[in-house]
Structure formats: C-alpha cells, structure tokens
Amino acid sequence: MNSFGKRLIMTTFGESHGKAIGCVLDGVPAGLDIDETFIQNELDRRRPGKSKFATARKELDEVQILSGVFEGRSTGTPIAMVIFNKDQKSRDYSNIKDIFRPGHADFTYWHKYGIRDYRGGGRSSARETAARVAAGAVAKLLLKEFGIEVEAGVCEVAGIEAKEFDFDYAKTSEIFALDPYVETLQKEAILKAKEAHDSVGGAVLVRATNLPVGLGEPIYYKLDAVLAEALMSINAAKAVDIGLGREASRLYGSQNNDQITKEGFISNNAGGILGGISNGEDVIAKVWFKPTPSIFQKQRSIDVNGNEVEVELKGRHDPFVAARGSVVAEAMMALVIADMLLLNATSQLSHLKKVYL
C-alpha cells in the first residue's frame, strides 16, 4: 500500500532514480494557512549532501505545490506536491542490476513483483521519505493551530546513549543529537564506521507536546498502535517503544503505573497514551534503526538466477541513517496525530452540535 491514514490520507509516489517523488495529502480542512517556506525548511532539514555524516548525493529537494492551495490557503481538496530528482547516478548501480544486495529489499521485491528497479533501490529507497516530510510539514501546520508541537532527535548511536534530551539542541546538531555532551563520541563512532566502509545503527526519540485528552480510536486504530505502524514504516526502522516500551516489562505494576493527583499524572511511563487514547501528557516514542545496509565491503550474495556471487557496492549512502530518519519520524508522528485530531472531531454528539447548531 502506498497510502496512510483514515481521515487525513497521505499517498506517496516515485522512485529513487525516477523523474520525481511526491505526495498527495487528502483531508486537509479548508482555510489552513499553507506556509510554503516552512514546508521547504522541513525538507531542507532532511535533505542529503549537507555533511560528512550523510550521503553525498546532492538534492535540492525543492518542493512544488500542484493543487489544493489557493492564495496561500488550503481549499479542502487534495494537496499534491512534487519534488524533482536532480542528482541521480544510476551508473553506480549497473554492476548489481541482477544481484541482490544483502540487507536490502532487492530480494523480496524481486520475488514479490518479478521485476525491480535496481537503481538506488527504486521505490524501497529512503529517497521516498522526502515526500513524507512534505506531507508531514502540512500536518505540522495543522497541529500548530491547536498548539501541538512534534520534535525529534537522535538519542543513541552505535550503543552510545544520550543522558540528556535537549530537543532545541538537536535542531542545530549535524546528526540531530539530543545530548551535546556525548555528541562528539557519537560522531566519532559514525566516522570510524565510515572510514572502515561500514555503517552504524542507533535510535531516535520523538515526542508530541500539548495534546488534548481523547485522541485515538479503540480498538483497532489505537493511537499507540497506529504510531508504531507509522514509525515502523520508515526505512531501516526495526523496533518502536512507546513510553518506557520494553523497559516496562521488567518492572512491577507499582513501579510502572502513572499515579494521578488532581494536578495531573506524577510520571509518564505510558508515553502519554492509555488504552490507545492520549491522556494529555507528552506522547513519547523511540524508534530503533538498523545500520545502513549499503556498505562498501565485499559481501556474499546471489543473483536473480540463483548463482552465488561476491558483491561490492558503489554509490553514495548514509553511514548512519537514523540522523535524517529523525526528521521523517517527526513527519510520521505529525501525520498520525493530525489524523487522530480530525477523527476525534466526531467522537461525541456535542462536537457535532457545535458545528451544526
């Protein structure tokens, strides 16, 4: 499926080395101020080729809005956006056109469809996530109307964990690091792997603040379930924790429960979600990313005919995919919360009466 959402529906299209990538966002209420500069700034945050910690592919990622916006405001019709690819080097992939790259989707795409675009991974490439960031930027503009903010940053690199979580600092960091005191060690780990023609994994912390109580649609469209689905759909994501996540399984109930006073919750181990519904606390999730599978070492594989081969990749790839993945995680959380916000508008009769009576 290439679409995501119930009331706010995002559809993305395009391939890594195709003419363009883009998205169609359906369900945006009419009258929303569409700040094109903000959308472009979000794309610039994810854009490749800006540092030695990311791929050297240089894409401007200049977005064009094709529909759904008139005189700076949403019209209520689908908002279509396109980003034309400028810096494809398909020749870098000619040596693996019939070979399955270890760790990539080549093997599964070939067996599922009987055909694959070998140029940069085609549709399975993280290049697709630029379209998600464009759609997520519009979702952020909608959330801003309600005072809701979504932020993210890197909390772990190659096992080096952040001890502090400074989301403002992450906005200025080359690797979106949340902790300035371990950032140097994290950068060194990335560069060490890069010099060895290898890669490292890590984790991203993403949070939403100032949510109202009540977002989430039990039983089969719970806020945490959909959020996990959205974050797991990001390239190289391998696990998601909501709140304490896996750590909660090691605690007693007396330790894990977020006790309540008339002033509010004493703790936020649940990550802002109870029973699949937001409880008014910050919604917090952690996404774990595997090491980038594109490494420049000789590896064993097979070709489309089943012959064993030795493959050594060329091209331009991120040594640490979680850094730019943090911007994508923000976009996906924003899309989920905006979707839930629209769905919740019809959860009570009193809500409808405010509109129609």
UniProtKB/Swiss-Prot annotation:
The free-text function statement in the UniProt record for this protein reads: This reaction introduces a second double bond into the aromatic ring system.
Q: Summarize where NADP(+) binds, as residue positions.
A: R46
State the organism named in the record: Nitratiruptor sp. (strain SB155-2)
Q: Which residues cross the membrane?
A: none
Q: Which PROSITE patterns does the record match to this protein?
A: CHORISMATE_SYNTHASE_1, CHORISMATE_SYNTHASE_2
Named in its record, the pathway it takes part in is: Metabolic intermediate biosynthesis; chorismate biosynthesis; chorismate from D-erythrose 4-phosphate and phosphoenolpyruvate: step 7/7
Q: Name one Pfam family in it.
A: Chorismate_synt
Instruction: Describe its assembly.
Output: Homotetramer.
Superkingdom of source? Bacteria
Q: Which gene encodes it?
A: aroC
What family classification does the UniProt entry report for this protein? Belongs to the chorismate synthase family.
The protein here is known as Chorismate synthase
One GO MF annotation is: chorismate synthase activity
Q: Write out the GO cellular component annotations.
A: cytosol
